Amino acid sequence: MTLERTFVAIKPDGVQRGLIAEILGRFETKGFKLVGLKQLTPSKELAEKHYGVHKDRPFFSGLVDFITSGPVIAMVWEGEGVIASARKLIGATKPLEAEPGTIRGDLAVNIGRNVIHGSDGSDTAVFEINLWFQENELVDWNPSDQAWRVE
């Protein structure tokens, strides 16, 4: 399996509720490498591009309003199978359908306040990483325990 990268964002509700360390810890404990991290309040333009696939849906403006309502923690994680694994760590979009042990299953309240976003596939990951990060904001590094993470 080859290394891949995925985009993950802790949404304003997760930031306001003090869940940043809890969420970061789950990805680090799993063994993924954090290669990009920043805190920002997204602009309306960034939010509309990010959620562009939903632009004709009735909930689009609510998504944009919410994600721009406060700070977001934008991250890029790297590892073998990180896209699919991140989706499993995150859990179902609707928290009531998310399994216990997942981020949403343990921490999210409802679909409108589901704490976290993660890319749903490789094409989406590339698009979202390039939308939220400049290349020089991503750090290529090797953790000292790398030999203990993968063969």
UniProtKB/Swiss-Prot annotation:
<dbReference type="InterPro" id="IPR001564">
    <property type="entry name" value="Nucleoside_diP_kinase"/>
</dbReference>
<keyword id="KW-0547">Nucleotide-binding</keyword>
<feature type="binding site">
    <location>
        <position position="104"/>
    </location>
    <ligand>
        <name>ATP</name>
    </ligand>
</feature>
<feature type="binding site">
    <location>
        <position position="11"/>
    </location>
    <ligand>
        <name>ATP</name>
    </ligand>
</feature>
<dbReference type="Pfam" id="PF00334">
    <property type="entry name" value="NDK"/>
</dbReference>
<feature type="binding site">
    <location>
        <position position="93"/>
    </location>
    <ligand>
        <name>ATP</name>
    </ligand>
</feature>
<dbReference type="InterPro" id="IPR036850">
    <property type="entry name" value="NDK-like_dom_sf"/>
</dbReference>
<keyword id="KW-0546">Nucleotide metabolism</keyword>
<keyword id="KW-0597">Phosphoprotein</keyword>
<keyword id="KW-0418">Kinase</keyword>
<comment type="subunit">
    <text>Homotetramer.</text>
</comment>
<dbReference type="GO" id="GO:0004550">
    <property type="term" value="F:nucleoside diphosphate kinase activity"/>
</dbReference>
<comment type="function">
    <text>Major role in the synthesis of nucleoside triphosphates other than ATP. The ATP gamma phosphate is transferred to the NDP beta phosphate via a ping-pong mechanism, using a phosphorylated active-site intermediate.</text>
</comment>
<keyword id="KW-0808">Transferase</keyword>
<feature type="binding site">
    <location>
        <position position="59"/>
    </location>
    <ligand>
        <name>ATP</name>
    </ligand>
</feature>
<dbReference type="InterPro" id="IPR034907">
    <property type="entry name" value="NDK-like_dom"/>
</dbReference>
<dbReference type="GO" id="GO:0005737">
    <property type="term" value="C:cytoplasm"/>
</dbReference>
<dbReference type="GO" id="GO:0005524">
    <property type="term" value="F:ATP binding"/>
</dbReference>
<keyword id="KW-0460">Magnesium</keyword>
<feature type="binding site">
    <location>
        <position position="87"/>
    </location>
    <ligand>
        <name>ATP</name>
    </ligand>
</feature>
<keyword id="KW-0067">ATP-binding</keyword>
<dbReference type="GO" id="GO:0006241">
    <property type="term" value="P:CTP biosynthetic process"/>
</dbReference>
<keyword id="KW-0479">Metal-binding</keyword>
<feature type="binding site">
    <location>
        <position position="114"/>
    </location>
    <ligand>
        <name>ATP</name>
    </ligand>
</feature>
<dbReference type="GO" id="GO:0006228">
    <property type="term" value="P:UTP biosynthetic process"/>
</dbReference>
<dbReference type="GO" id="GO:0006183">
    <property type="term" value="P:GTP biosynthetic process"/>
</dbReference>
<feature type="active site" description="Pros-phosphohistidine intermediate">
    <location>
        <position position="117"/>
    </location>
</feature>
<keyword id="KW-0963">Cytoplasm</keyword>
<comment type="similarity">
    <text>Belongs to the NDK family.</text>
</comment>
<dbReference type="GO" id="GO:0046872">
    <property type="term" value="F:metal ion binding"/>
</dbReference>
<protein>
    <recommendedName>
        <fullName>Nucleoside diphosphate kinase</fullName>
        <ecNumber>2.7.4.6</ecNumber>
    </recommendedName>
</protein>
